[in-house]
UniProtKB/Swiss-Prot annotation:
Taxonomic source organism: Helicobacter pylori (strain ATCC 700392 / 26695)
Chemical reaction(s) catalysed: tRNA(Tyr) + L-tyrosine + ATP = L-tyrosyl-tRNA(Tyr) + AMP + diphosphate + H(+)
Annotated motif 'KMSKS' region, positions: 232-236
Name this polypeptide is given: Tyrosine--tRNA ligase
The protein's role, per its UniProt record: Catalyzes the attachment of tyrosine to tRNA(Tyr) in a two-step reaction: tyrosine is first activated by ATP to form Tyr-AMP and then transferred to the acceptor end of tRNA(Tyr).
Keyword annotations of the record: Aminoacyl-tRNA synthetase, ATP-binding, Cytoplasm, Ligase, Nucleotide-binding, Protein biosynthesis, RNA-binding
Amino acid sequence: MEQKIAIALKEIARGTNEIIGLEYIEKLVRKYYETNERFIVKAGFDPTAPDLHLGHTVLIQKLALLQQYGARVKFLIGDFTAMIGDPTGKNETRKPLNREQVLENAKTYEEQIYKILDEKHTEVCFNSTWLDALGAKGMIELCAKFSVARMLERDDFTKRYKENRPISIVEFLYPLLQGYDSVAMDADIELGGNDQKFNLLVGRFLQRAYGLNKEQSVITMPLLEGLDGVQKMSKSLGNYVGITEEPNAMFGKIMSVSDDLMWRYYTLLSTKTLEEIEDLKHGILNQTLHPKAVKEDLASEIVARYYDNDQAIKAKEQFSKVFSANLLPEILSESDFDEGVGILDVLKQIGFCPSTSQARRDIQGGGVKINQEVIKNESYRFVKGNYVIQLGKKRFMKLNIN
């Protein structure tokens, strides 16, 4: 029993930024092993962006891992706040949504998350269920439990206050509403990104303030680096792997990451145990395994997760054909640009190069091809049409210039 619990805690801690309340997590896991009683793990997701890439799945992978050790996952869609929108007006991606849009996006989430989560032990929730019912009296009672001084401890609020920049009252409500979610859901553990730590701790505080006989444990997860290994994975930066991408494109993108970044992906995305990952590292060190083969295993695992084993095998075969014969892949990821865009900007925006200076070096070194022709002109600009841009032997993307 003790060894099982130790292994569980080690796997739960894997890849995390911080865990607050580890002792409580140990208690929950122990109780599950002894009584088969599950505990509640909560994680909130933005209903405005249901199209997931691997960066989004870091949290979901951790939720799936926790399910193995007794978690009942409550996948929270913050529809109440989404229907308000961004009170500052600065975040254009957080425009107010109507109920129909929220439900449509939630449906898309469900189609994607059950490729990772055990549906039997997952419940999709909407915070409008309890926040709509809170009413004016309940909202005032909620606000009374937290001080402005405590709210100003949040870094971005502190900075704006010192710079005499406006902070909306509604912005103060966001952490309180998220924290109240933990009260309403009776959460034992809450997961979130490292940038959400303040809000997660508000939930812990409010559980005490509302008289719950618990304080939720908090697990914060890091942002996943994109394919360039420099910036966070992002669609806008072009350094992402979408979980609905074609298998060949998904496989090829994962194979394009550096050997160092591969281990980061193994830690945050693979279902292999830490012990199994260490065995792979030792295999490379003692030269019984080749890094390319280990990376192929990772790519195969991820493709199989979102498709199936047959598709993973075919994607591996296709990649091997391209890699060995320097052929063009049959299926490419695509990016759209306006006519007149320069090649340096394109290389940066699609995530092939982290900087303009690196893009220049790659062009000068003959590593950049357009439609299989080496480009040495760093002032090259695209006219209207379709192109295939290539960096090195393994990185390809289709460009649609409009």
